[in-house]
Amino acid sequence: MRICHSRTLSNLKDLPITSRRAMHSAIVNYSTQKAQFPVETNNGEHYWAEKPNKFYQNKRPNFQGITFAKQQDLPSLPVPELKSTLDKYLQTIRPFCNDVETFERQQLLCKDFSEHMGPILQDRLKEYANDKRNWMAKFWDEQSYLQYNDPIVPYVSYFYSHMPLPNHLSKIDNDPLIKATAIISTVVKFIEAIKDESLPVEIIKGMPFCMNSFSLMFNTSRLPGKPEDNQDTNIFYSVYENNFVTIAYKGKFYKLMTHDGNDKPLSENEIWRQLYSVVFQGSQSDPKLGGIGSLTSLPRDQWREVHLELMKDPISQDSLETIHKSSFMLCLDLDQSPVTLEEKSRNCWHGDGINRFYDKSLQFLVTGNGSSGFLAEHSKMDGTPTLFLNNYVCQQLNKLDVDDFMRKVITPSSTVAMKPMELPFIITPKIHKAIESAQLQFKETIGEHDLRVWHYNKYGKTFIKRHGMSPDAFIQQVIQLAVFKYLKRQLPTYEAASTRKYFKGRTETGRSVSTASLEFVSKWQNGDVPIAEKIQALKHSAKEHSTYLKNAANGNGVDRHFFGLKNMLKSNDDQIPPLFKDPLFNYSSTWLISTSQLSSEYFDGYGWSQVNDNGFGLAYMLNNEWLHINIVNKPAKSGASVNRLHYYLSQAADEIFDALENENKRKAKL
């Protein structure tokens, strides 16, 4: 890749070695011939810009500076105490011990670890964490995401499917270009709030949450690294300097402006006219020259090799850089008209593998019948920030005055129409062959997955709270009971707990299987146990789950601590601790059931792939009046069925409902 300016290299010397390597691979010669330099934010991230953000912020009359105002006050991620972690581990392992001897072996392994390598690794981790506000950040980003080689779709990215707009907004909802205009215009308003730093800090239960993800949300992309590095990178650009989005249509990409030359957001009419032009251009162009997005569906090592080939040509290079620099991507899937929850979920999750650019951090989707959704690349952002964004977008769309909005769309606001620009790529025979291979691999990979949506309308959070339980903990019990009914055993179960109360916090594992959950599912399936005792076991298990999840959110889980300790091992250490090599230790974190909750009254779908090919991925939402789980697995690999789990989820939810209602009636008669 060409170096654009000699000053860049001197700036790079001030960066850490790993950052220099990543940044060096990203320095480019833009078609605009404007030099870009790495600038460090207050959060320690680096973005590429002609001028630092402060230059633009000082010129914004509405700049407030509140979005990131609490960042320096956030606590650093703590290193848990070793004894506490080992004690918690023993509690979580007990349900998987079939006899006393097995559990006693785990106790001996923990004792050996606590007396030998454990304290050494703990001291190393504390020393490593001493000058870092988040000791896990680099390890987690690289090892959990950037070094992961499987295709990021379907295996890493996650999606939201938006509910249809109310009937009185059908003029907007049923016209895909009008709907796309509304989405783009609304997201631009959100971007303006980011530029003004007027977005309020998220406060959860009185605690400010880390807002770092919002500085990394727009004008960013995952980037294939060098083949020899076996690792991807992330690249970030100034949110103030790149006022355009990328539109995907019929497998091609177009640059669509969102602001005028004075940094003023374009009108709805100017956005709509550009979208109309994209569709017109797309219908006239040669489809054989598209399909570049398919390459982002490849395993990462294959994509890195093809990426090198693409970057040899300056035309393709400029087009890729434009996509990376764009605020976000909007995919027009005008040949798709999903109706069922499963159809909508699949289109948002993976689509056709052609009309996407999976490396792009944010992709909104609009289909031919106006159905909309969202796909997120996961490496630098977890779900809560993008949930916030999508909630905002859907909320604003639901508030639109249809007549006023349609008038804005059809009324020209400028005599000079902005013209979108198709992003050209030079497709050599080698690249063409890679595109064909990518599309074949994509179809095969997606074909291995089953997806079924469990949307349960009998009750929701209102009913659960009335019976004194946390809705999240309750649905975890429904899942445990359904799995136990289906497979006659419990499986290691993961629930994501947010640690955003800490600086650059992401997630910790909530272990859903416990002695309490084993007692609950065992008693529930035992016909000799009285209903009152079953309900007591249910409530006790739910309470225990809430306690564990609270500890996890406070940074005091088990799994991230073990992850950190493993990273403290050195090549000259005598041996790997026996605990880390133990089959049961490793089985306990083999997430055969992976779960996570992100809920919105504006979504009718949310999901992602299973974490382990032998298990299920269960993404769930909780509404006041309904429950929703997106069920995904690989049936041929796992030998399990999404349809059967769907059945047992309904059976479990029905039985618990009947038991709670009947117990209430019994008590009322006393």
UniProtKB/Swiss-Prot annotation:
It comes from the Eukaryota. InterPro entries: Carn_acyl_trans (IPR000542), CAT-like_dom_sf (IPR023213), Cho/carn_acyl_trans (IPR039551), Cho/carn_acyl_trans_2 (IPR042231). GO terms for biological process: carnitine metabolic process; fatty acid metabolic process. CoA binds at residues 461, 465-472, 498, 597. The keyword Repeat does not apply. Keywords: Acyltransferase, Fatty acid metabolism, Lipid metabolism, Membrane, Mitochondrion, Mitochondrion inner membrane, Peroxisome, Transferase, Transit peptide, Transport. One of its GO terms (cellular component) is mitochondrial inner membrane. Pfam families: Carn_acyltransf. PROSITE patterns: ACYLTRANSF_C_1, ACYLTRANSF_C_2. A motif (Microbody targeting signal) lies at residues 668-670. The active site is at 378 (proton acceptor). Its EC number is 2.3.1.7. Induction: By ethanol. Repressed by galactose. (R)-carnitine binds at residues 494, 507. One of its GO terms (molecular function) is carnitine O-acetyltransferase activity. It is an enzyme of class 2 (transferase). Belongs to the carnitine/choline acetyltransferase family. Carnitine acetylase is specific for short chain fatty acids. Carnitine acetylase seems to affect the flux through the pyruvate dehydrogenase complex. It may be involved as well in the transport of acetyl-CoA into mitochondria. This is Carnitine O-acetyltransferase, mitochondrial. The lineage of its organism: Eukaryota, Fungi, Dikarya, Ascomycota, Saccharomycotina. The gene is CAT2.
